[in-house]
Amino acid sequence: MLQKLLEANNLKFEDKFYEDCEVFVKLLQQWGTIHNLSGRLTRDDIYENILDSLYPLTFIEKYESFADIGTGAGYPGLILAIALRDTKAYLIEPRIKRVSFLNFVKATLKLDNLVVLCNRVEEVKDLQVDLITSRAVTNTSLLLDITKNIKKPNSSYLFYKGSMLESELENAKVNNYKIVNKKDRNYLYIKGLI
């Protein structure tokens, strides 16, 4: 059960959140099979991805806005938007099939805090956010470079990384960061780059 999994990781949400997640699970399973949105479509796999998406809420600050780069099937950006309904969320995804899915979930769940952009992040104009997130898109240096156009002077970053993080950081030239490890995931939290 999702609620037990999240609460075991110090994440607590209202009942509405869990109801919305169950709708998301069903929609992802339906769309995912037809449109190849994700390779992991069992309920347990989706629950693990939801936990992976939300776990950083246990250690990051609260932000007024965020943009998720390459949201794909919804991780982490869509899940964060469901959990943080008073935070303005932007999902930036260039693939039309995935954008259609994200917009369908947005409409179904009435996510008024959410904007889905069908674009590559480097082509996005007139958007600046407090937090930039990304999971499994590209290396840290390139992510920092291609997101310059959407960052504020003091934006923070949250990248969901794997085992190659240490070597990526050597090339990225960042400071004021924190790495939080959970299983095979390394969460890279970079506070307020200027």
From Swiss-Prot:
Reactions catalysed: guanosine(527) in 16S rRNA + S-adenosyl-L-methionine = N(7)-methylguanosine(527) in 16S rRNA + S-adenosyl-L-homocysteine
GO MF term set: rRNA (guanine-N7-)-methyltransferase activity
Record key words, sorted: Cytoplasm, Methyltransferase, rRNA processing, S-adenosyl-L-methionine, Transferase
EC number: 2.1.1.170
Residues annotated for S-adenosyl-L-methionine binding in this entry: 70, 75, 121-122, 135
GO cellular component: cytosol
Coiled coil: none
Entries under Pfam families matching the protein: GidB (PF02527)
Keyword Methyltransferase appears in the UniProt entry: yes
The keyword Transferase belongs to this UniProt entry's keyword annotation: yes
Sequence similarity: Belongs to the methyltransferase superfamily. RNA methyltransferase RsmG family.
Protein name: Ribosomal RNA small subunit methyltransferase G
The organism of origin for this protein: Aliarcobacter butzleri (strain RM4018) (Arcobacter butzleri)
